[in-house]
């Protein structure tokens, strides 16, 4: 845990008592702050109180006594309208911050030279975070990984000069971190997302920009116009900017040439790493993730040999194009995290012949945006509530069956794929749907796929992230 010593002897209010909220409250208390916490969920309040955290409805609190208000990133700060606690805090002139801001202040207080790599973007954040941390760890560096990837940042070990921090940041977290100041800030990409919470694409992009604007070195993917404009703006302001591209040769920066990762310096090219044969980093989208990780690791002092070794040993993330098993020429891939069409596109673009398991609780737009990948699909196996709509979209373009359940889909897809003599084929779960019609969440759905695949006679499991 990182004790939040920057608020020692001060009173702090806190709202949001999920897992990260309780962890943040404990860090404040350990640092010597007096914390008063609340949540709209009575069960969460009771759980926090049972751990010794002082709780009270903040509507009746004396806000003039608080030095800061710590807000859970899941609670609306501005849109669709500010949460009632935010209005109370602002009315009393109390600053509103989140756990990432607490971490940034503690790093400056305890070890301002501790390498800090912060990652954001609409897609690819978690893979880039995990990959960067893995490369650092495999090179023997003291490395802590947390943030939006699943471990509350204040539960990490405290900052010290040689300890590396790799932190995934959502737009909600950045919005609550006004002094975020990473050694290397990574902005991968920007597409419309979370606009219910941010109002407009412009506001969403401006929040993401803060992470790289506050960084010592800004590493920015320039394959979309929003990020390209941010890179130009920061460079004009005198900031060090490293551009990356997964599809375009650059004059300066890092780009992908097939499976080779290239560095460009004033138009002169050299290969810095390669992804050939690394199953966990297959696909153009993973080239972008790897480029960002390579640039960040070079920034904090790793050499190319250390980086290549880390790339080759990266196990990948569970439920994200995760290779879970193989039987002869048939590969089984769990991409359960693909809960909409955009998220399914990378996997569909990464394999030439696919037995595709899709469906679940449908999202707006369906699978029409994936039509360009239909020629790669040997057959589709449709499950869940989306099956009728998906079958209508596939029409005569792709052979399909309505399997109904995931277990039936895996069994039928494996049977058909085994008879395919066209070379390597893949049984791919990339649902393009939420899971809630048949499963608790995408993780449970992915585990069900793994179990169904491993139950097939002759399938050999592939080690990876579990």
Curated annotation (Swiss-Prot):
Cite the annotated pathway: Cell wall biogenesis; peptidoglycan biosynthesis
Q: Where in the cell is it found?
A: Cytoplasm
Provide the coiled-coil residue spans: none
Keyword tags: ATP-binding, Cell cycle, Cell division, Cell shape, Cell wall biogenesis/degradation, Cytoplasm, Ligase, Nucleotide-binding, Peptidoglycan synthesis
Query: What reaction does this catalyse?
Result: UDP-N-acetyl-alpha-D-muramoyl-L-alanine + D-glutamate + ATP = UDP-N-acetyl-alpha-D-muramoyl-L-alanyl-D-glutamate + ADP + phosphate + H(+)
Q: Which SUPFAM superfamilies match?
A: MurCD N-terminal domain (SSF51984), MurD-like peptide ligases, catalytic domain (SSF53623), MurD-like peptide ligases, peptide-binding domain (SSF53244)
Judged by the first EC level, this protein's enzyme class is ligase
Tell me which EC number(s) this protein carries.
Answer: 6.3.2.9
Against InterPro entries, the record matches this protein to: Folylpolyglutamate_synth_CS (IPR018109), Mur-like_cat_sf (IPR036565), Mur_ligase_C (IPR004101), Mur_ligase_C_dom_sf (IPR036615), Mur_ligase_cen (IPR013221), MurD (IPR005762)
Q: Which HAMAP family match?
A: MurD
Q: What is this protein called?
A: UDP-N-acetylmuramoylalanine--D-glutamate ligase
| Organism from which the protein derives | Mesorhizobium japonicum (strain LMG 29417 / CECT 9101 / MAFF 303099)
